[in-house]
Protein backbone atom coordinates (compact mmCIF):
# COMPACT_ATOMS: atom_id res chain seq x y z
CA UNK A 1 0.00 0.00 0.00
CA UNK A 2 2.97 2.32 0.40
CA UNK A 3 3.65 4.79 -2.44
CA UNK A 4 6.18 3.79 -5.09
CA UNK A 5 8.72 6.40 -3.98
CA UNK A 6 8.75 5.02 -0.43
CA UNK A 7 9.00 1.42 -1.63
CA UNK A 8 11.97 2.39 -3.79
CA UNK A 9 13.69 4.18 -0.90
CA UNK A 10 13.12 1.27 1.47
CA UNK A 11 14.28 -1.31 -1.07
CA UNK A 12 17.39 0.71 -1.87
CA UNK A 13 18.23 1.17 1.82
CA UNK A 14 17.87 -2.58 2.37
CA UNK A 15 19.82 -3.71 -0.70
CA UNK A 16 22.80 -1.44 -0.10
CA UNK A 17 22.67 -1.47 3.72
CA UNK A 18 23.24 2.25 4.14
CA UNK A 19 22.05 5.01 6.43
CA UNK A 20 19.00 7.04 5.36
CA UNK A 21 21.10 10.14 4.61
CA UNK A 22 23.41 8.14 2.35
CA UNK A 23 20.48 6.58 0.49
CA UNK A 24 18.94 10.02 -0.10
CA UNK A 25 22.24 11.46 -1.36
CA UNK A 26 22.64 8.98 -4.21
CA UNK A 27 22.43 10.27 -7.76
CA UNK A 28 22.45 8.68 -11.20
CA UNK A 29 26.00 9.92 -11.72
CA UNK A 30 27.04 7.42 -9.04
CA UNK A 31 25.97 4.58 -11.36
CA UNK A 32 28.52 3.57 -13.98
CA UNK A 33 29.61 0.35 -15.68
CA UNK A 34 27.35 -1.82 -13.53
CA UNK A 35 28.66 -0.35 -10.28
CA UNK A 36 26.97 1.90 -7.71
CA UNK A 37 29.76 3.99 -6.23
CA UNK A 38 29.51 6.45 -3.34
CA UNK A 39 31.17 7.56 -0.13
CA UNK A 40 29.41 7.04 3.20
CA UNK A 41 28.52 10.33 4.84
CA UNK A 42 29.31 9.45 8.46
CA UNK A 43 32.59 7.58 8.02
CA UNK A 44 33.58 8.71 4.50
CA UNK A 45 34.15 5.05 3.62
CA UNK A 46 34.11 4.54 -0.16
CA UNK A 47 31.66 1.88 -1.29
CA UNK A 48 31.33 0.09 -4.64
CA UNK A 49 28.39 -2.26 -5.09
CA UNK A 50 27.88 -4.41 -8.16
CA UNK A 51 24.48 -3.73 -9.70
CA UNK A 52 23.04 -7.22 -10.07
CA UNK A 53 19.95 -9.20 -9.10
CA UNK A 54 17.33 -7.37 -7.05
CA UNK A 55 19.39 -4.15 -6.95
CA UNK A 56 19.52 -4.11 -10.75
CA UNK A 57 15.76 -4.72 -10.93
CA UNK A 58 15.13 -1.91 -8.45
CA UNK A 59 17.27 0.58 -10.38
CA UNK A 60 15.42 -0.30 -13.59
CA UNK A 61 12.08 0.20 -11.79
CA UNK A 62 13.27 3.60 -10.57
CA UNK A 63 14.44 4.52 -14.07
CA UNK A 64 11.08 3.58 -15.60
CA UNK A 65 9.13 5.64 -13.05
CA UNK A 66 11.47 8.62 -13.43
CA UNK A 67 11.01 8.54 -17.22
CA UNK A 68 7.35 9.49 -16.76
CA UNK A 69 8.26 12.98 -15.49
CA UNK A 70 8.82 16.01 -17.74
CA UNK A 71 11.90 17.18 -15.86
CA UNK A 72 14.69 14.69 -15.26
CA UNK A 73 16.35 14.65 -11.85
CA UNK A 74 19.90 13.45 -11.30
CA UNK A 75 18.81 12.21 -7.87
CA UNK A 76 18.25 8.49 -7.75
CA UNK A 77 15.24 8.78 -5.44
CA UNK A 78 12.44 11.14 -6.41
CA UNK A 79 8.94 11.79 -5.09
CA UNK A 80 5.62 11.37 -6.91
CA UNK A 81 6.27 14.59 -8.88
CA UNK A 82 9.80 13.70 -9.94
CA UNK A 83 11.46 16.03 -7.44
CA UNK A 84 14.33 15.02 -5.18
CA UNK A 85 13.25 12.90 -2.23
CA UNK A 86 14.15 14.87 0.88
CA UNK A 87 14.60 13.72 4.46
CA UNK A 88 11.30 15.39 5.43
CA UNK A 89 9.38 13.77 2.56
CA UNK A 90 10.84 10.38 3.33
CA UNK A 91 10.04 10.71 7.03
CA UNK A 92 6.42 11.74 6.46
CA UNK A 93 5.80 8.95 3.92
CA UNK A 94 7.45 6.36 6.13
CA UNK A 95 5.58 7.45 9.27
CA UNK A 96 2.25 7.33 7.42
CA UNK A 97 2.93 3.88 5.96
CA UNK A 98 4.09 2.58 9.34
CA UNK A 99 0.99 3.98 11.03
CA UNK A 100 -1.27 2.55 8.30
CA UNK A 101 0.35 -0.84 8.93
CA UNK A 102 -0.41 -0.55 12.64
CA UNK A 103 3.24 -0.56 13.69
CA UNK A 104 4.37 1.63 16.59
CA UNK A 105 7.16 4.12 15.93
CA UNK A 106 9.41 2.60 18.57
CA UNK A 107 9.07 -0.84 16.97
CA UNK A 108 10.34 0.03 13.49
CA UNK A 109 12.27 2.98 12.08
CA UNK A 110 13.62 3.53 8.58
CA UNK A 111 17.16 3.22 9.87
CA UNK A 112 16.38 -0.35 11.03
CA UNK A 113 16.63 -1.42 7.38
CA UNK A 114 20.43 -1.07 7.63
CA UNK A 115 20.63 -3.52 10.52
CA UNK A 116 18.17 -5.87 8.80
CA UNK A 117 20.26 -5.76 5.64
CA UNK A 118 23.46 -6.55 7.52
CA UNK A 119 21.84 -9.32 9.57
CA UNK A 120 20.31 -10.98 6.51
CA UNK A 121 23.55 -10.75 4.54
CA UNK A 122 25.49 -12.18 7.48
CA UNK A 123 23.09 -15.14 7.64
CA UNK A 124 23.25 -15.71 3.87
CA UNK A 125 26.91 -15.03 3.05
CA UNK A 126 28.83 -14.62 6.29
CA UNK A 127 30.14 -11.91 8.53
CA UNK A 128 32.76 -10.57 6.11
CA UNK A 129 30.14 -9.88 3.42
CA UNK A 130 28.02 -7.99 5.94
CA UNK A 131 31.06 -6.04 7.16
CA UNK A 132 31.95 -4.98 3.63
CA UNK A 133 28.39 -3.91 2.74
CA UNK A 134 27.92 -1.91 5.93
CA UNK A 135 31.34 -0.29 5.52
CA UNK A 136 32.61 -1.29 8.95
CA UNK A 137 36.36 -1.41 9.49
CA UNK A 138 36.11 -4.30 11.94
CA UNK A 139 34.08 -7.48 12.12
CA UNK A 140 33.61 -6.75 15.82
CA UNK A 141 31.46 -3.74 14.96
CA UNK A 142 29.51 -5.76 12.41
CA UNK A 143 28.91 -8.53 14.95
CA UNK A 144 27.61 -5.99 17.44
CA UNK A 145 25.47 -4.29 14.81
CA UNK A 146 23.92 -7.47 13.44
CA UNK A 147 23.56 -9.30 16.77
CA UNK A 148 21.70 -6.47 18.48
CA UNK A 149 18.87 -6.92 16.03
CA UNK A 150 18.11 -10.54 16.82
CA UNK A 151 20.58 -11.47 19.50
CA UNK A 152 23.64 -13.62 19.11
CA UNK A 153 23.24 -17.26 18.17
CA UNK A 154 24.14 -19.38 21.16
CA UNK A 155 26.08 -22.43 20.04
CA UNK A 156 27.03 -23.92 23.39
CA UNK A 157 24.64 -25.06 26.07
CA UNK A 158 25.37 -26.78 29.39
CA UNK A 159 25.46 -30.56 29.51
CA UNK A 160 24.24 -32.46 32.59
CA UNK A 161 26.93 -34.38 34.39
Model regions and ranges:
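Short, leucine-enriched amphipathic alpha-helices that occur as contiguous helical runs
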Residues: 6-7, 87, 91, 114-115
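C-terminal catalytic core of tyrosine-transesterase DNA break-rejoin enzymes
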Residues: 8-11, 15, 21-22, 96, ...
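Conserved tyrosine-mediated DNA breakage-rejoining catalytic core shared by Y-recombinases
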Residues: 16-64
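Catalytic-site neighborhood detector that most strongly recognizes the C-terminal catalytic loop/helix
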Residues: 40-44, 127, 134-159
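C-terminal catalytic core of Y-nucleophile DNA break-rejoin enzymes
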Residues: 41-61, 72-96
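C-terminal secondary-structure termini that scaffold catalytic or DNA-interacting sites
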Residues: 64-69, 79-82, 158-161
Amino acid sequence: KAPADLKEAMDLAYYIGQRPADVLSLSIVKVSDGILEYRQGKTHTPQRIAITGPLEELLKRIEVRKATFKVASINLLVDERGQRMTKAKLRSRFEKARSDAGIAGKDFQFRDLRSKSGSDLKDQHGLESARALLGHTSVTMTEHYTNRRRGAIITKIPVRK
